[in-house]
Amino acid sequence: MKTKIPDAVLAAEVSRRGLVKTTAIGGLAMASSALTLPFSRIAHAVDSALPAKSDEKVIWSACTVNCGSRCPLRMHVVDGEIKYVETDDNTGDDNYDGLHQVRACLRGRSMRRRVYNPDRLKYPMKRVGARGEGKFERISWEEAYDIIATNMQRLIKEYGNESIYLNYGTGTLGGTMTRSWPPGNTLVARLMNCCGGYLNHYGDYSSAQIAEGLNYTYGGWADGNSPSDIENSKLVVLFGNNPGETRMSGGGVTYYLEQARQKSNARMIIIDPRYTDTGAGREDEWIPIRPGTDAALVNGLAYVMITENLVDQAFLDKYCVGYDEKTLPASAPKNGHYKAYILGEGPDGVAKTPEWASQITGVPADKIIKLAREIGSTKPAFISQGWGPQRHANGEIATRAISMLAILTGNVGINGGNSGAREGSYSLPFVRMPTLENPIQTSISMFMWTDAIERGPEMTALRDGVRGKDKLDVPIKMIWNYAGNCLINQHSEINRTHEILQDDKKCELIVVIDCHMTSSAKYADILLPDCTASEQMDFALDASCGNMSYVIFNDQVIKPRFECKTIYEMTSELAKRLGVEQQFTEGRTQEEWMRHLYAQSREAIPELPTFEEFRKQGIFKKRDPQGHHVAYKAFREDPQANPLTTPSGKIEIYSQALADIAATWELPEGDVIDPLPIYTPGFESYQDPLNKQYPLQLTGFHYKSRVHSTYGNVDVLKAACRQEMWINPLDAQKRGINNGDKVRIFNDRGEVHIEAKVTPRMMPGVVALGEGAWYDPDTKRVDKGGCINVLTTQRPSPLAKGNPSHTNLVQVEKV
């Protein structure tokens, strides 16, 4: 049977940058094309809204997962069952300058298949086999509550509240009542705070290194201009920034990126080891680069800019610390400034010429020179980095280096420019569920919880990044794992984690709360079935939303399936058994809490309609009154009146705080913390001697068919976007690998068997796996699901103690 292609598609004139806007029905090609279109520019020309049947209800819901977008869903319900799903096709229009529609991507539109998935958890269960075997027996809710409450009280009495840990989970990140991260904003945290607190964590698997690195540059979380501001840009440079797959919906960045470029006609340059869907013919240039070498490229660019007088000296003198000797702190060593480092006048004596950078990055020297001149002479320029470059062993320094391009050229704090960080956005002060204060001030890196189980009392502030005290007193004895797959699937070095969790004398109780039998759920001692977003009422807040912020009324669409309960019901019942019910609930049901929070939100946002009006309306939108969000605008306009939160109040190219840390912390060989944004290869780089045994760099990427591991069990998405290992034809030919061949990817940490995708869209010497595929081991622990974390390392990055998920050396062979 042949698929008939609509005449509108056949008649469309397809050009390189016009590909997307001339594709009226992008979804038709979605399953068969190598490049899935993340949005459709004229999709509103086709009326997708079918007339509702007389017995049909249309109820607003939302996709609340951790992609960087939040999208409304309109559920068509007949006799208590979801029949099909639409998105925002009746509020606003496709007008970029107005309150545009927020259309869900292929993931959100498949929500019905998540709700009715055969993997759904149906009732409470307790483990009867070894952890990881997935052997459980059904128990009642009362028994589950009693087991949890009794054992938690025992562990607190024996080890203290510091032994209770809330694991990282972002499965319901967009919710208000149901929010699953950060841990301090969850209902589990509220429960624990009523019971004496818990061991907290800092950082996150998405952005640990950039959050820490740019904190020492700008102070706090590094802000960025909204992508809508690209309408004022002349040039867009994206380092490892791939919104076309990560934030691809109408609520995300891709829409703004392309709409704004239609106004400004800005050139777009993508720097990435992999040719991503953000390009897909819309980019003007793709520059492939070796993973982990972004800082070396920036240093080569800076050399050209400095020697050819393309830097904004006035900006550097007024707003920055440490560019040259004029602004170098007195505490710094002679020639300890950035300019000296780049020109080879610093301690290493090496000039960071384009030729030097080319040897490291794989980018030709003449291309580096050309790019430096273009960036240095084109203003305003939107220079941005995604969170791929920072997810490396040298990620903190790399983020500081990339931001230097925006700093050197004076593009910070102006329309059309950016800080060098990822894009920012306008946000509304909507009130979320209060979770009280944690009496325990101790925290660890979110990435080092397995170490805290294995060697907790040995972990110190100077060696392991423990915060709040000099060292941990006790190991982790209980884990709450709510709406997250980081217990196994999303945490690095799965085989090591498996060994640690298998011993239930170490961590004595693991409680998993989830909707599906995930890889992590199989390691639970007590497994509680959660409601999906479609089975309860909540508010969903936007995330990467450009210059139009919004809130979605996520109504209850159907009754909870099987014996599933909401997280509020579960924690309220546990609070009753733990003797803190009144403190926890304050006498309110979930809906009463929502009405209470909404009333508070209306005080902060007077334009909000009444609760009942909002329930019918489904989504509330508001444009940024300033037009576009411009990061550090106030600082740029008056740095004296609006200083940054760095120690100097300025942009710190040289950081004395980092110099102090470098002098006092205990670091393993190869780890580097430096006051300047230098290049350091880090461990398992392409320069590592280990590459003789494992000659290929393995990097990950966020795949369009999943949000991390969420939606990873939806059949149609798996069929449309197969899990494959991407490999360049040159590397494949050396190994006798053809497209579609089964290959083994392996290193000392594990082995994965998966099909190969042979494509020139990969940098030679580099292979890639989409992260989030569900771990599926055989009896020899060889993974058949394509889970990259079988191969990643639990060695943390130096400063943030974050996950270096893209720093891996492997070998690949045909099976």
Give a label for each model feature.
Residues 2-7, 183-271, 296, 406-523, ...:
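Extended redox/cofactor-interaction regions of prokaryotic respiratory oxidoreductases
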Residues 2-310, 336, 355, 461, ...:
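N-terminal export/assembly segments and adjacent metallocofactor-ligating motifs
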Residues 263, 274-378:
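Long, well-ordered, tryptophan-enriched scaffold segments
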Residues 283-289, 549-560:
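Short beta-alpha connecting loops at secondary-structure transitions
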Residues 567-617, 709-711, 715-726, 730-815:
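Long, contiguous, secondary-structure-rich segments that constitute the structural scaffold
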